[in-house]
Amino acid sequence: MGCTLSAEERAAMERSKAIEKNLKEDGMQAAKDIKLLLLGAGESGKSTIVKQMKIIHEGGFTSEDNKQYKPVVYSNTIQSLVAIIRAMGTLSIPFGDNERESDAKMVLDVIARMEDTEPFSEELLAAMKRLWVDSGVQECLGRANEYQLNDSAKYFLDDLDRLGAKDYMPTEQDILRTRVKTTGIVEVHFSFKNLNFKLFDVGGQRSERKKWIHCFEDVTAIIFCVAMSEYDQVLHEDETTNRMQESLKLFDSICNNKWFTETSIILFLNKKDLFEEKIKKSPLTICFPEYTGKQMYQEASAYIQAQFEAKNKSSAKEIYCHQTCATDTNNIQFVFDAVTDVIIANNLRGCGLY
């Protein structure tokens, strides 16, 4: 009889070895394919993170991209000024100079004619500049938490001469500061540290959330964005719910969701630059009445972080937290590098390769 293997048995062994090899290769390939889901409430900075990935990993914006963002910059700028003018009516703040009424009418007429994406005429630019330095407008800007105003309002309105120039072309920073509501799902692909990333940005407003569900399969990690600066603001959608309380509720539902028991969760406490300015004058007790700490960045941001981390009900799950400024490319590059290292370690462990 002997111990030689029959041709059939040899073929079966070869097949088995090949399957094992393929499984290992598949495992290594799976470890290289990274699916990231960007979640968070509306205006938490998700789309800005996507733009940063384009800058950091895809060579930035083309001149064609720059051109396409021009009307967005014009619209964001004039719409921000209009939001302030309308809020002055609601908050009963008069113009410092009555002559600004006619300037305000000119700006409102541009919106009414739906010409907000056009370059500013000389006349319009002069009116906007006069309005921007008006004491009433500046007073209303200081109360921006009482109405809905783009974070980038001051950034753009402080630079009207540059934006109004005939040869104006958006800079990288201008593009990062633009705001367009995300509807549907935006997908970005890039490679980094020998990994293939697919990043999905889904709309944060309540009406957009039902579109998330089919993105949930095979997610390697979730990046959950929170705007730290929104602790004293209410939602666009209902004007009564505190934005940070809404974020906490949403984080709770994501963090403890059955879909995500095996998924790494990375928390970006974003807009730290705005938070640092705001915390000096607007108390954290607006959102957290039980807070007794100082109105200082370190203590207040640590408290916010602790509130989010406390939502995690699983002792086996670690939340990886970073304080970020999504408009700062160096900061996001540094943070994303750290995030990738965590993903690599967790992923290899999950594939039994670490």
Curated annotation (Swiss-Prot):
A lipid is attached at G2 (N-myristoyl glycine). Residues 197-206 are annotated as: G3 motif. Residues 266-273 are annotated as: G4 motif. The keyword GTP-binding applies. A lipid is attached at C3 (S-palmitoyl cysteine). GO terms for biological process: adenylate cyclase-modulating G protein-coupled receptor signaling pathway. Residues 324-329 are annotated as: G5 motif. Gene3D superfamilies: GI Alpha 1, domain 2-like, P-loop containing nucleotide triphosphate hydrolases. GO terms for molecular function: G protein-coupled receptor binding; G-protein beta/gamma-subunit complex binding; GTP binding; GTPase activity; metal ion binding. Mg(2+) binds at S47, T182. GO terms for cellular component: cytoplasm; heterotrimeric G-protein complex. It comes from the Eukaryota. Residues 32-354 form the G-alpha domain. Keywords: GTP-binding, Lipoprotein, Magnesium, Metal-binding, Myristate, Nucleotide-binding, Palmitate, Transducer. GTP binds at residues 40-47, 176-182, 201-205, 270-273, 326. Residues 35-48 are annotated as: G1 motif. PANTHER family: G PROTEIN ALPHA O SUBUNIT (PTHR10218:SF362), GTP-BINDING PROTEIN ALPHA SUBUNIT (PTHR10218). Belongs to the G-alpha family. G(i/o/t/z) subfamily. Guanine nucleotide-binding proteins (G proteins) are involved as modulators or transducers in various transmembrane signaling systems. The G(o) protein function is not clear. G proteins are composed of 3 units; alpha, beta and gamma. The alpha chain contains the guanine nucleotide binding site. This is Guanine nucleotide-binding protein G(o) subunit alpha. It comes from Lymnaea stagnalis (Great pond snail). The lineage of its organism: Eukaryota, Metazoa, Spiralia, Lophotrochozoa, Mollusca.
